[in-house]
Curated annotation (Swiss-Prot):
Subcellular location: Cytoplasm
GO biological process: negative regulation of ATP-dependent activity; peptidyl-lysine methylation; peptidyl-lysine trimethylation
GO MF, any single term: protein-lysine N-methyltransferase activity
Enzyme class: transferase
Catalytic reactions of this protein: L-lysyl-[protein] + 3 S-adenosyl-L-methionine = N(6),N(6),N(6)-trimethyl-L-lysyl-[protein] + 3 S-adenosyl-L-homocysteine + 3 H(+)
GO cellular component: cytoplasm; cytosol; protein-containing complex
Pfam families: Methyltransf_16 (PF10294)
Source species of the chain: Homo sapiens
Protein name as catalogued: Protein N-lysine methyltransferase METTL21D
């Protein structure tokens, strides 16, 4: 994948800026740290999903599909996906834990000149009561959130609580084969199907350059309740 890294040898925090070129020639600059946990780096799934949002298959004709739509990103980390959506005209809330808010706000500030919608950062801890999010968003975006087994049920609770029946949830994840990863992925989909319908987006509909056979994009939508017959 043809994005680039910038770093400083004099930086004690070992920070790196990942540069992601958009289709219009502008670039997103994403600050990340080599230490500090999984949320401090830009994962490949975030790049794949960000570039998918730019594809003609997703964007549609005329105004972009995200223009003036409300978007919530879960597990934002560096905010890559949410920032891409904001540059495409969406009104975005990027969310993660308290300890990642400074990094999110730094990346928002670094890219604010590219934003054509709006973007703000908020704290959201999966599994806890939803506060400060008054209505279901049009879209929920999530990249590489299927990672820790202990976070699956809290994540799905938050998805169920914060989404509406018309919310389009787009989940991008890397399929990992080491250790317990296959079991974690299997459990995620077993739990997901209890309350949600989902479908996989074919690889040929991903960005032609930023794609990989082991990185998947799925559309998810909350199941509508059925009345007893």
């Amino acid at each position: 994948m043809a994005d680039t890294l910038e770093s400083s040898l004099e930086d004690p925090l070992r920070s790196f800026v990942r540069v992601l070129e958009k289709r219009d020639g502008t670039v997103l600059r994403l600050q990340q740290y080599s230490s500090g946990g999984v949320g401090c780096v830009v994962w490949d799934a975030a790049i794949v999903l960000s570039k998918y949002l730019e594809t003609p298959e997703f964007s549609g004709d005329g105004a972009h599909a995200l223009s003036r739509r409300s978007v919530l990103e879960l597990g934002s980390g560096t905010g890559a996906v949410g920032l891409m959506a904001a540059t495409l005209g969406a009104d975005v809330v990027v969310t993660d834990l308290e300890e990642l808010q400074d990094l999110l706000k730094m990346n928002i500030n670094m890219n604010k000149h590219l934003v054509t919608g709006s973007v703000q950062a908020k704290v959201l801890k999966w599994g806890e009561e939803i506060e400060g999010f008054p209505s279901p968003p049009d879209f929920i975006l999530m990249a590489d959130c299927i990672y820790y087994e202990e976070s699956l049920e809290p994540l799905l609770k938050t998805l169920k609580d914060i989404s509406g029946f018309e919310t389009c949830i787009i989940c991008c994840y890397e399929q990992r084969t080491m250790g317990k990863n296959p079991e974690i992925e299997k459990k995620y989909f077993e739990l997901l199907q209890l309350d949600f319908d989902f479908e996989k987006i074919p690889l040929e509909k991903h960005d032609e350059e930023y794609r990989s056979e082991d990185i998947h994009i799925i559309y998810i939508r909350k199941k509508k309740s059925k009345f007893p017959s």
